[in-house]
Amino acid sequence: MPAVRIKICGITRVEDALAAAAAGADAIGLVFYAKSPRAVDIHRAREIVRALPPFVTSVGLFVNASRCELGEILDAVPLDLLQFHGDERAEDCEGHRRPYLKALRVKPGDDIVGRAAAYPGAAGILLDTYVEGVPGGTGAAFDWSLVPTDLGKPLVLAGGLTPDNVGRAVEQVKPYAVDVSGGVEASKGIKDAARVRAFVDAVRSRRRDET
């Protein structure tokens, strides 16, 4: 199994972004959704992205943002990848000069494969926990047995991951990448560097155990 990529989402401070990169994270996520306790404004986001070392991917998370809002942010912040967490259609996600991930919130009975197929231009599909009225960052895991064996695209697993359970998640789901936010925080929006390192180590050690 190839090395699983790791994204630390909900970054709000330069020091947390640098700590994530130093721990070995492949990507950091910035939340552009005002209702989130982890939201960042354009000025802070630009500061964080500019501080990143080479080869660490910057991801912008959006929830039902307008094209005007997206354009304003993308003109100011050099994001590498977009992540759509709302009710966006495929056409809403495309045409922004960036590759994108589409997040799908999982609940029993979902046709996940069919829903994913509605986004043929997506670079990958992120699966997160369904909580009514909450687009993400719930801190709750979902039933990993619901994850299809093949989505036809890279699978990013999110939802309630922590240093304690991510090894089991990687072993069971075999995702392309894992995405964590609350599971490595000291408080909402503030990362705990020790928990970030523990999370990365748990993913990497699982990979080593399989080689």
From Swiss-Prot:
Top-level class of the enzyme under EC nomenclature: isomerase
Gene3D superfamilies named in the record: Aldolase class I
Entry's EC annotation: 5.3.1.24
Keyword NADP tagged: no
GO biological process: L-tryptophan biosynthetic process
Catalytic function, reaction form: N-(5-phospho-beta-D-ribosyl)anthranilate = 1-(2-carboxyphenylamino)-1-deoxy-D-ribulose 5-phosphate
Pathway(s) of this molecule: Amino-acid biosynthesis; L-tryptophan biosynthesis; L-tryptophan from chorismate: step 3/5
Keywords: Amino-acid biosynthesis, Aromatic amino acid biosynthesis, Isomerase, Tryptophan biosynthesis
GO molecular function term, any single one: phosphoribosylanthranilate isomerase activity
Transmembrane stretches, start-end: none
CDD domains: PRAI (cd00405)
HAMAP family in UniProt: PRAI
Recorded family membership: Belongs to the TrpF family.
Name of this chain's protein: N-(5'-phosphoribosyl)anthranilate isomerase
Organism: Pseudomonas aeruginosa (strain LESB58)
Gene that specifies this protein: trpF
